[in-house]
Amino acid sequence: KRALDIACIDYTTNPHEDFDIAHINTYGIKSIMLLFRAKRMGKKVVYHGHSTKEDFRNSFIGSNLLAPFVKKYLTFLYRHADLVITPTEYSKQLITSYGVDVPVIAISNGIDLSKYCQSPKKEQAFKNHFQVLPEQKIVMCAALYFKRKGIDDFVKVAEMMPDVRFIWFGETNLWTVPGWVRRL
């Protein structure tokens, strides 16, 4: 939304209003309904292809059993788009390898760097909240509890460096996480 506002481009987030292009960012039931509705209306569809079978695998209990079906479903969705935008060249290669024959381009998910500038006040609030000692080094990760996000390596390194504070930001219902991750 922010990019469209900055560029002074009209848009709607209401799928029942008139639009020229549908940009779909997820793969739930509402997304597939919007995809088919847009196609029936002769509208162009841009799909944000950040989900892949490879990302889905090893993520939740049972994900490896479902992964082949997820791949078929995602391939179906992406093939019905007019354009697929992925965040990385890697995901572009994966999606293209599925036989998706519409244009697939990689555009990084940019961030607003001004939101992440140094702030001594925020740094102190963070250190107080997490009870970080003065001069103590901190290693952080922001991700769900997935092997592909490196949670096992994060824990191993933390065990080897007891003088460094390791903090993992990310929350997942532990009942969906494989047992070996819960035991870390």
Residue spans of the language-model regions?
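Acceptor-binding helix/loop patch of EC 2.4 sugar-transfer enzymes
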Residues: 47-72, 114-115, 179
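Active-site proximal beta-strand in glycosyltransferases
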Residues: 21-23, 37-56, 85, 105
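Carbohydrate-associated surface elements
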Residues: 90, 110
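Short N-terminal targeting/anchoring amphipathic segment
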Residues: 13-30, 44-46
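Conserved donor-binding/catalytic core segment of Leloir-type glycosyltransferases
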Residues: 133-149, 155-161, 167
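Glycosyltransferase donor-sugar binding loop
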Residues: 111, 142, 165-182
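A short helix/loop element that forms part of the nucleotide-sugar donor recognition site in Leloir-type
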Residues: 117-132
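Membrane-proximal helix-turn-helix segments that form the acceptor-binding/catalytic region
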Residues: 40, 65-84
